[in-house]
Amino acid sequence: MVRSRPERLLMESQQALQKGELALARRRCEEALEAAPKLALAHQLAAAIAIKAQDDSQAQQHLRAFLDLQPDSVEGWLSLGNSYRRSGAPRDAELAYRQGLRVDLQHGGCRRALVRLLHEQGHSVHAIPIAEAGLRYAPQDAGLLTLLGEALLETEAFEEALYRFDNALRHRPDSAAARQGRALALRGLDRQEDALSELRALEQAGLQHFSLAHNLGNVLSDLGRLEEAEAAYVQALALNPDYGPSYSNLARTRWCLGDDAHFLEPFETAFASGRLAPPLVKAYLDALLAVGERARFEKARNGFPDNLLAEPALQDTLARAAAAAGEFPTAFQHHRKALSDAEPPLQWECHAAQTELLAGQPGQAAARLERALARDPGNGFLLAYLAVAWTLLGDPRAETLLAKDLVITKDLGVPPGFETLDAFHAALKMELEEEHTARQHPFEQTLRGGTQTQGNILRLPRPAVSALRHQLERAVEDTLATLRSRSGPAPHPAFTVPGAWRFSGAWSVRLKPKGFHTMHVHPMGFYSAVYYVEAPPEDPQDPQAGWLQFGPPDLTLPTTVPVRETRAPVPGRLVLFPSYFWHGTRPFTLGSHRTTVAFDIAPRVLPKND
């Protein structure tokens, strides 16, 4: 068979590429393109050579030329999308993957790549239907099932995620990704011991990956095994020194273990070695703000290069720091830069509204928050700050949003199996004390002068905790039934009472004398509650010492927001309220401790099992 000159050159180029001789491969391919500029295979090979040389810009140029000549090549669109993804152009990558699927809806590679990309970009809600559609063509695609499970985890559909991971493991029992995903779903379902078993099995099978070590740290932390969690996060950073969440979790764990002098050293070691990724720097600066280290914050800030601080995420942090110092013009400049992206995180919009409130601009804050709520109607932070803005404006909608009858008090009484309330609380305190393994409060939390348990405290299969859980479940059902039966408008269009629900978080707090909670909200829930196990005695000098109060935010505003409601901490009493209500506690001085169990509830996403 007689080959043309371009064909011979391409064959020589391909042989050189296989041998790793990139310079020769590139030269022969360029000669082929000079001889035949519209030869599709030459552009395809040139792209492969560029990818091997880690030159994605050149690869994209040749892939676009190849696709102009062969627009129905799904593999070409997949390669182009992958190249865009590697070079940090997610929108272009998404368009390429979608074009590939237009050519062939059943192409598994393009669909998996698109689902993975959307999940990575924080668009799991959009990734889920794309994955589900693909499973209609390939129901045994373990990779797609795993990706679907990972996207479902982000939406807290833990039961559905577990079902998908189990299905993936039926088709590919050795899939480490599906096994680890299964562990994360179990953790989300408050089955920490089962999650730990799954992760340990992967460890014993020889898997060494930073994500495994990081997830082990998270589960061990949930279980209150903080020293072991610390070691796991250290191992995660040894395997991947660039993974920001491991730095944050390690710092948080060391702080809880009482190391408030050196808890941020891992960040500083990373910076000294030249690791200056924006998420890492933001986490460090945010931690300094959280613990009130303003001088250290300014020193650290001045040590980072200007081009790094120009990143939107860091502009958000600088805006918050300026607002806290009362430097509002500077804060607004930083906010504008942080919010310059087409769709910035809603949390940053909330920070900007917070600055507007601090600066005495509730009208601007309300307008911003109402726009943001159109993107996420159930966002608890947005509702909380909107309630403040409406209150300051005298807007009657504030009274509806903060209606007093939304705070519900129930005295639960003695659960079965216990003779008296005192006997129940004595047993409950003993079980809870075993879980208070931290030496001080988490630095990013709102309690001061006490400790907080890790993970979901209501998961514990212990007699008193189990009895309390049954009481709380009945109380929540009764409360939701009451809310559903009420006529009239809802407090807000976002305020809908769920059908199936779950505990999205539950923890115990043990405050010491002079301890208290700053004013805060619970953004992870729909309704929240606190059950009083132990309360300080009445103080003649301060009749409301240790009381729960609702109303003002944790902001020093030009106009004071009054306290709207107060509740006494009576052992055996449960107080339920919307999670977006600003609430906190007054400090107390008498007695030994103030012990509570608090929780949030959220809608429960049931599995489809299709």
Regions from the PLM with identified roles:
Residues 463-473, 477-576, 581-610:
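Catalytic core of non-heme Fe(II) oxygenases with the double-stranded beta-helix
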Residues 17, 51, 78, 85, ...:
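Position-specific recognition of the canonical hydrophobic site in helix A of tetratricopeptide repeat
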Residues 400-495, 516:
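Non-heme Fe(II)/2-oxoglutarate
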